[in-house]
């Protein structure tokens, strides 16, 4: 039976963190800005527990794909909230929302 080399695992994690920071400069800048106006730099408290040094910032999402502001594409295996039901930006839902918004969206 083999054992896990914890030192090697820690070294790999450190290397991945460096790569993440290098590859996400725009997300890092936005996170630093967000920290000035939001607790933990995120819109919801459960988002504070991010696995890396800062979260990615999404530019857009379609179906099960999210694109961050750096242009990296991710497959969204979580599809939280309404994304789980229909994917991100389903055309029929986007069209229905746009039709309604043209009628007014801030009425009391």
Please state what every model-predicted region is.
Residues 40, 62, 70, 79, ...:
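Short glycine-rich loop/turn motifs that provide flexible caps or phosphate-binding loops at active sites
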Residues 26, 58, 66, 85-89:
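Generic, well-ordered alpha-helical segments
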Residues 51-52, 63, 82-83:
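Short active-site-proximal "capping" loops at secondary-structure junctions
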Residues 1-11:
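Short, compositionally biased low-complexity segments
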Residues 9-60:
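Active-site-adjacent loop/helix segments that line or gate small-molecule/cofactor pockets in enzymes
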Residues 55-76:
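Active-site and channel-lining beta-strand-loop segments
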Residues 2, 73-108:
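Glycine-rich loop-to-alpha-helix module at the N-terminal edge of alpha/beta enzyme cores
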């Amino acid at each position: 039976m083999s054992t896990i080399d914890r030192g090697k695992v820690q070294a790999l994690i450190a290397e991945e963190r460096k790569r993440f920071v290098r590859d996400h400069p725009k997300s890092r800048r936005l996170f630093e800005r967000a920290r000035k106006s939001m607790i933990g730099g995120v819109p919801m408290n459960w988002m504070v527990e991010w696995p890396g040094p800062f979260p990615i910032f999404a530019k857009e999402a379609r179906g099960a794909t999210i694109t961050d502001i750096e242009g990296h594409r991710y497959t969204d295996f979580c599809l939280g909230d309404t994304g789980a039901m229909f994917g991100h930006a389903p055309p029929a839902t986007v069209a229905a929302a746009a039709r309604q918004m043209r009628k007014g969206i801030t009425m009391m």
